[in-house]
């Protein structure tokens, strides 16, 4: 069976706009894994709970570098030894509207806050239960990672702010 790559991308963009997850796999020569990607702008508590339940549960929030700067999110480790150069920032929770921060509802709330165009550093607390990731400028053309794929897909879907969330899919 032959797949039309353009049709697959269009289907993924449609699903992101509808708040549904898409599965993005990388090369077997890289991490050899797949991540669920949801748009923080369109997803629901139910989909966040689903992603937690059917993934590693480790939720990341990819965003463009300028967005991380606006939220005053420094890198977790300034001189990372990660060979893949994943740019983790400090973890966060929403400053308001959450309890412990760990529930799907609380993490969904944190994602909503991170996705709000007018959100500032005062809208999140550190540390927390969501791990923002800083995407490389230029997207997958400059770094073929899930972080950049998530941000690029949200951009192509016309979702603002260009922001997503990832959950590693075990066994991929």
List the model feature ranges, each with a label.
Residues 1-172:
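Catalytic domains of riboflavin
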